[in-house]
Regions:
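Helix C-cap/helix->beta junction micro-motif
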Residues: 120, 147, 178-179, 292, ...
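N-terminal small-domain helix-loop-helix segment of the aminotransferase-like
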Residues: 1-84, 368-373
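Active-site phosphate-binding strand-loop segment of PLP-dependent enzymes
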Residues: 131-198, 372
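PLP-dependent aminotransferase-like
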Residues: 95-153, 174
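Conserved core segment of the aminotransferase class I/II
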Residues: 208-279, 287-288
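PLP-dependent enzyme catalytic core of the Aspartate aminotransferase-like
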Residues: 74, 104, 314, 323-332, ...
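Conserved glycine-rich beta-strand-loop-beta hairpin in the small C-terminal domain of fold type I
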Residues: 261, 277-286, 297-311
Length: 373
């Protein structure tokens, strides 16, 4: 079965580099190469200066994998494989699933978490949130069947900013253990948390069939490195991922691996400015939302860098987004890009430009009240 076009990425391709203002980006502002290298210690700087632009190890640079393990219980680099995040998501589904397997997946979600599963010919059930964007593990349990092979979760959650408690995450692990199925946990926004939230451990720390995906794109503000990694205690699974990777990227970029090592070893210099910026932008948007009738509901995110904002409009969210980018140059991602019913747009809080965008959006909404409401 062929995969459908990636709607969200195609929408970004259409507008991301032509729109004047981006209000829906899920990543944080990208740091410059000099910023990364300025944080390198002498050993790391020597690695950079001595870099060879040949092939790298297919599983990932051993020093990079060792740097990754500082954030996990496992200290065995054989339980870590490096690749681009999208590639690793794709490979995971391909090596784990067969036609007619059953999968339970969080929804709404980044399209690739569902589409690859569909393309294999699996049956998929969706674990959906309540109106306040909370996910109930008891509802998940009712979706699991005897032939369920995989549970797909994503917390911090894109696009809603929802999060779980440790008790809720442990419930999910218990459900998976009871049914002997894998858990694939998209943790790309790991560590981006509101002050009120307690950081969850990676799923690979809690369950031998737990597969954790993280990378430098979101939390670190280093999306251009295209560095991601899987961590799993199941060495056979890791081996199959590496073997499948031989048909795709084969290996990672040597410069990206060294820059990723530096970022991981100096994580607070990347993470803390992003957390501060996200929280400031959330507060600004909350004030803005209170003054706008077109915003029906704004639930501040508990985690991650995005929120799913409900609109009070007489058109679809896609029509709203198209009109907004055409008339005001502001790009937003509508609910249709997540196959989610209702009138919502994703708002991203990881960019310094948000305070400058809101006044422009305010003028647009005031000038188009009759059209929108």
């Amino acid at each position: 079965m062929k995969m459908k076009d990636f709607k969200l990425e195609r929408y970004f391709a259409q507008h991301e580099f032509t729109a004047k203002h981006l209000l829906s980006s899920s990543d944080c502002d990208g740091y410059g190469q000099d910023y990364v290298l300025d944080r390198a210690n002498p050993t790391e700087l020597k690695m950079w200066n001595d870099i060879k632009l040949g092939y790298t190890e297919s599983a990932g640079n051993p020093i990079l994998r060792e740097s990754i393990t500082q954030f996990y219980k496992t200290k065995n680099i054989e339980e870590v494989v490096v690749g681009s995040p999208g590639e690793l998501n794709y490979i995971t589904m391909r090596v784990l699933l067969e036609k007619q397997d059953h999968v339970v997946a969080v929804s709404p979600a980044y399209q690739s978490l569902h589409e690859v599963v569909h393309s294999i010919g699996c049956e998929i059930s969706y674990w959906k949130p309540n109106e306040n964007w909370t996910f109930n593990p008891s509802q998940l349990e009712h979706l699991v069947r005897k032939n369920t092979k995989l549970i797909i979760i994503n917390f911090p959650h894109n696009p809603t900013g929802s999060y779980l408690t440790l008790s809720e995450l442990n419930q999910i692990v218990s459900i998976a253990k009871k049914n002997d199925c894998y858990i694939f946990s998209d943790e790309m926004y790991h560590k981006l948390l509101a002050k009120s939230e307690k950081e969850l451990p990676p799923i690979s720390d809690l369950y031998s069939k737990g597969i954790s995906l993280w990378g430098t794109s979101k939390s670190f503000g280093l999306a251009g490195l295209r560095t991601g990694w899987l961590v799993c205690n199941d060495l056979d699974f890791i081996h199959r991922v590496i073997c499948y990777k031989d048909y795709l990227s084969i290996c990672s970029s040597a410069p990206s691996e060294i820059l990723s090592i530096i970022a991981l070893n100096h994580i607070d210099d990347f993470l803390q400015p992003n957390i501060k910026k996200i929280q400031q932008n959330i507060n600004l948007f909350a004030e803005f939302a209170q003054t706008q009738d077109v915003i029906s509901s704004f639930i501040p995110p508990k985690s991650g860098s995005t929120a799913f904002v409900k609109l009070n409009i007489n058109c679809s969210s896609l029509e709203f987004s198209n009109y907004l980018v055409e008339k005001a140059g502001i790009m937003t991602i509508p609910a249709e890009m997540f196959d989610h019913p209702g009138k919502f747009i994703r708002v991203g809080f990881g960019r310094e430009s948000l305070p400058k965008i809101l006044p422009i959006m305010r003028v647009f909404l005031e000038q188009n009240k009759q059209i929108l409401s």
